[in-house]
Curated annotation (Swiss-Prot):
Changing Y464A: Blocks IgM BCR assembly. Residues 324-452 are annotated as: CH4. Changing T410A: Has little effect on IgM BCR assembly. This is Immunoglobulin heavy constant mu. Keywords: Adaptive immunity, Cell membrane, Disulfide bond, Glycoprotein, Immunity, Immunoglobulin, Immunoglobulin domain, Membrane, Secreted, Transmembrane, Transmembrane helix. It comes from Homo sapiens (Human). Constant region of immunoglobulin heavy chains. Immunoglobulins, also known as antibodies, are membrane-bound or secreted glycoproteins produced by B lymphocytes. In the recognition phase of humoral immunity, the membrane-bound immunoglobulins serve as receptors which, upon binding of a specific antigen, trigger the clonal expansion and differentiation of B lymphocytes into immunoglobulins-secreting plasma cells. Secreted immunoglobulins mediate the effector phase of humoral immunity, which results in the elimination of bound antigens.
Length: 474
């Protein structure tokens, strides 16, 4: 073929947003060039060099060559949002080319800031103290700063700010929430000091004031949450319950909660009112039972709330998420480590549940055919599988005395998940199976990446100082 200069194309990922990973990869494809002599370089928008590049060998296709280059950028830099693109430059004997490669866009959402104040009788101790609670919700990206002011001056002591957490949601961009509390003296509060929760996010400042002379802000507007039935509740109670939670009610006597089907038909709804909360509000829950088949069909159900404080009814609609792949869990039962048994104190049995989808799973322990009390074991929340996108794993840890284990008592881990043939499977372990792993026949090799790291960390977090060793029978 005749000599020709390359044509350039940007390569960008359509996967997760940069807030989910530590680095962001973008690439550049050079195509249809001859001869096979090409040099890639990368620059930021301001023309400074990017060093973290990776080239791939050129490929001959249809008489001409193609090659790619990749650059890895720290996601915290991309999150700054100062560069919309980076520049891919190519040198070739038949002409130099350059192409702008766009960087992923972060969903930038401001926080909603609310301050919850103590009720009049909420002060205790000597001197009498209580807490102000500040909550920032619905923001992205996760970098945020929360501080407290009293009469405009920063407060240094009595502040506790939790870690930023991702909010649970089915779809849409990942958003975050954070809670901060300030311990206050009753004398300062009744002396009408003005306290301020200040939230700094992406160069913007959000402030919410609180004082004993302020009337409750309209920010404590009534909120409605429609909660779908969990698989665990369906499995345990054999009923499919829709739950509608209403919060921040100033009075409870005029609230009504009703569930309706997609066709408008009412579903019998039972309502419960809470006791008064620390911020002097009430909450209410409206529950309705439906057929599991109706829920599984994808039918939409709507919760409608009326109250004298609302100018018009509030509505929330839910349905079972569509298109979620079903993957049955693999269940592995790991006996106590020998080092732990040698201490003659307790025995820890671990039930590892891996590779399942959707994330809803139920784990229960049994001894001699009887369910054990939930206080005896700890089950983790389902977490995404590191190596298998869209699948989850969880683990449950049962602690018994070393004497019980050594008597040869058998323990059974029961796992229920909607993808299992009969919705339930179980694994049993006792002293005679020590050194073995009770598991499905397939894929124990794939277990190590997940098991060794997470179980050890989980045990350490529960203050076990012994090393956990997992034995595999060849």
């Amino acid at each position: 073929g005749s000599a020709s200069a390359p044509t350039l194309f940007p390569l960008v990922s359509c996967e997760n947003s940069p807030s989910d990973t530590s680095s962001v990869a973008v690439g550049c494809l050079a195509q249809d060039f001859l001869p096979d002599s090409i040099t890639f370089s990368w620059k930021y928008k301001n023309n400074s060099d990017i060093s973290s590049t990776r080239g791939f060998p050129s490929v001959l296709r249809g008489g001409k060559y193609a090659a790619t280059s990749q650059v890895l950028l720290p996601s915290k830099d991309v999150m700054q949002g100062t560069d919309e693109h980076v520049v891919c430059k190519v040198q070739h004997p038949n002409g130099n080319k350059e192409k702008n490669v766009p960087l992923p866009v972060i969903a930038e959402l401001p926080p909603k800031v609310s301050v919850f104040v103590p009720p009049r009788d909420g002060f205790f101790g000597n001197p009498r103290k209580s807490k102000l609670i500040c909550q920032a919700t619905g923001f992205s990206p996760r970098q945020i700063q929360v501080s407290w002011l009293r009469e405009g001056k920063q407060v240094g002591s009595g502040v506790t700010t939790d870690q930023v957490q991702a909010e649970a949601k089915e779809s849409g961009p990942t958003t975050y929430k954070v809670t901060s509390t300030l311990t206050i003296k009753e004398s300062d509060w009744l002396g009408q000091s003005m306290f301020t929760c200040r939230v700094d996010h992406r160069g913007l400042t959000f402030q919410q004031n609180a004082s004993s002379m302020c009337v409750p802000d309209q920010d404590t507007a009534i909120r409605v949450f429609a909660i779908p039935p969990s698989f665990a509740s369906i499995f345990l109670t054999k009923s499919t319950k829709l739950t509608c939670l209403v919060t921040d009610l100033t009075t409870y006597d005029s609230v009504t909660i009703s569930w309706t089907r997609q066709n408008g038909e009412a579903v019998k709804t039972h309502t419960n009112i809470s006791e008064s909360h620390p911020n002097a509000t009430f909450s209410a829950v409206g529950e309705a039972s439906i057929c599991e088949d109706d829920w599984n069909s994808g039918e939409r159900f709507t919760c409608t709330v009326t109250h004298t404080d609302l100018p018009s009814p509030l509505k929330q609609t839910i349905s079972r998420p569509k298109g979620v792949a079903l993957h049955r869990p693999d269940v592995y039962l790991l006996p106590p480590a020998r080092e732990q048994l040698n201490l003659r104190e307790s025995a820890t049995i671990t039930c590892l549940v891996t590779g399942f989808s959707p994330a809803d799973v139920f784990v229960q322990w049994m001894q001699r055919g009887q369910p054990l009390s939930p206080e005896k074991y700890v089950t983790s929340a389902p977490m995404p599988e590191p190596q298998a996108p869209g699948r989850y794993f969880a683990h449950s840890i049962l602690t018994v005395s070393e004497e019980e284990w050594n008597t040869g008592e058998t323990y059974t881990c029961v796992v229920a998940h909607e993808a299992l043939p009969n919705r339930v499977t179980e694994r049993t372990v006792d002293k005679s199976t020590e050194g073995e792993v009770s598991a499905d026949e397939e894929g124990f090799e794939n277990l190590w990446a997940t098991a060794s790291t997470f179980i050890v960390l989980f045990l350490l977090s529960l203050f076990y100082s012994t090393t956990v060793t997992l034995f595999k029978v060849k």
